[in-house]
Design a protein with these regions (language model features):
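Conserved "HGTGT" condensation-loop signature of ketosynthase/thiolase-family condensing enzymes
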Residues: 1-90, 111-114
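Conserved catalytic cysteine-centered active-site region
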Residues: 40, 46-54, 64, 96-134
Length: 134
């Protein structure tokens, strides 16, 4: 059996909505029993995170699904996503938090990428599966 050499030649990302500062977090995630978190400032000081991106409105309404965000990141790989997707032969996606269990996460991402045609899909499942090897 011969193995083909595979290289990562491009990366992309997608971040939903505007960045949310530490002071705004609870406006999106809510309070604990109607009160601000007692340990929030300590945790945030120690983890060093200054802002994050939520796929939520301030009222807690979802703005993007996990599979939609993955597909938008994939589209970011190409100047012309419709044309570039025609060359994709394999879509493999790993997540610990899929939108649902069936169909698989990779199948749902594939559904958001109609120009990828008959690309194969692989969807490893489980905790910390971003490091899964097949």
């Amino acid at each position: 059996m011969s193995l083909n050499q595979v290289y990562i030649v491009r990366t992309a990302h997608f971040l939903p909505n505007e960045p949310v500062s530490n002071d705004e977090m609870e406006e999106y995630l809510g309070l604990i029993n109607g009160k601000p978190s007692k340990s929030r400032r300590i945790v945030l000081r120690n983890n060093g995170i200054k802002r994050r991106f939520y796929a939520l409105t301030r009222k807690g309404k979802s703005t993007h699904t996990n599979s939609e965000m993955a597909a938008l990141a994939v589209k970011g790989l190409f100047t012309d996503a419709a044309e570039g997707m025609k060359d994709v032969q394999l879509i493999t996606c790993g997540t610990s938090t899929p939108d649902q269990f069936l169909p698989s996460h990779a199948s749902m991402v594939h559904g958001w990428l109609p120009d990828s045609g008959n690309a194969e899909v692989v969807s490893p499942s489980g905790a910390c599966c971003s490091d899964a090897c097949t």
